Amino acid sequence: MLDLKITKNILSKSTFEQITSDPILCTAPYLQSNSLIYLPVRMVPTVQKSSLTIFPEALLSSFSYTAYPFDFIGLYNREKYMQLGGFDYTITNPYWQNLDFSLRGWLWGEKICISSSIKLMYDEEIPLEDTTVDYMQLRFYLKNTAPIFINDHAYIPISRIFNYIHNASTNLFSAITDFKDARKWVEKNKYRFKMDMPHLVDNWERRRS
């Protein structure tokens, strides 16, 4: 995260109390560039050609849901953060790490919103997100996109191993190991899932303000 201007009165007492009393995973701020231009920080998940894509949109209302907080910036509910397991340190690309944690929250029934009551401005240039499709993206895929939700739990169909091996940049043994580990992780947490990625994307419109 780059330098931000933090002022003494950036958050009023009433706003802080409202945010801390609301059981939301993360409340993100409005963000401005150093030229006072508001950034399109509402991130909207969609599917294009069978692949998950995130589109940034301008904020049109005082309260909006977002797929993830841009640049990790937000007020996090500590208890919910811990329940989700925090950020996955094995995903070293910041973009995919942020997206992994945030969408895990959504898939497990949590919410992330943007509040107009909090506004921050960058002192320097706006950070660029590295959305390169690489090994880190594949780790994100296994934990978030590969699982299917049915009835009351999630699982990764064994049939998805073929597509994963085809796209993996690692050798066959490593790809199979990664896939097996991901299936074990989803099996361990299967009842924490409340939906899968297609359901989240399909129902996003009703969450948009």
List PLM regions with ranges.
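Acidic metal-phosphate-binding loop of nucleotide-sugar-dependent transferases
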Residues: L2-I6, I91
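Conserved donor NDP-sugar-binding/catalytic core segment of glycosyltransferases
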Residues: K5-T46
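Short catalytic/ligand-binding loop motif for oxyanion handling, primarily in non-cytosolic enzymes
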Residues: I6-K8, N34-L39, Y68, M121-E124, ...
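Amphipathic coiled-coil/heptad-repeat helices and related helical stalk/stem segments
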Residues: I10-S12, L59, N98
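Alpha-helical elements of Rossmann-like donor-binding domains used by nucleotide-donor carbohydrate transfer enzymes
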Residues: K13-E17, D100-R104, M136-F140
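Short, flexible, basic/aromatic active-site loop/helix in glycosyltransferases
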Residues: P29-Y30, V44-A67, D71
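A short, conserved alpha-helix in the catalytic core of glycosyltransferases
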Residues: Y68-G85, I91-I118
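Active-site-adjacent helix/loop segment of glycosyltransferases
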Residues: K111-R208
